[in-house]
Amino acid sequence: MHITMVKKRLADGSECRKCQEASEHLHSRGLWDRIDEVVWAQEGDAASPGMQLSSHLGVDRAPFFVVRERSGAQTVYVSVLQLVKERLGEAVTVQEQVQAIDPDDIGGI
């Protein structure tokens, strides 16, 4: 299994907030070393590797994760908690799930 994390770098050079939070979550659980590759989607640069991968896979948010199996099958995860639970074999608490809800992702709030 090969895990690629796609992170967004903003036009000012900083890493997006959600990408920082996802990285911190993986580090805090001791799972960062399970990420095999980090690819950057540069804001405003459609030719950047992360933007190309995002376009190819039809993903419109960052971070996201691409898990490739030896068989060539791949699965895309847009949630670090879903990745942790389904692919990294770690439990995810209800509290973590609630804390991961971002009002920016919910319309009308």
Question: What kind of feature is each model-predicted range?
Answer:
Residues M1, D33-W40, V98-G107:
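Charged, low-complexity, helix/coiled-coil-prone segments
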Residues V67-G108:
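Non-catalytic, surface beta->alpha helical segment in thiol-disulfide oxidoreductase systems
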Residues R9, A41-D45, E69-R70:
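Short beta-alpha junction loops
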Residues V39-R61, R87-Q95:
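Thioredoxin-like thiol-disulfide oxidoreductase module
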Residues V6, L57, V76-V80:
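Broad hydrophobic/π-residue packing in well-ordered secondary structure
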Residues P63-F65:
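Compact, well-ordered interaction domains used in eukaryotic information-processing assemblies
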Residues M1-E37:
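Local sequence-structure signature of Cys/Sec-based thiol-disulfide redox active-site neighborhoods
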Residues D36-V39, S54, V67-S71:
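Solvent-exposed, well-ordered amphipathic alpha-helical segments
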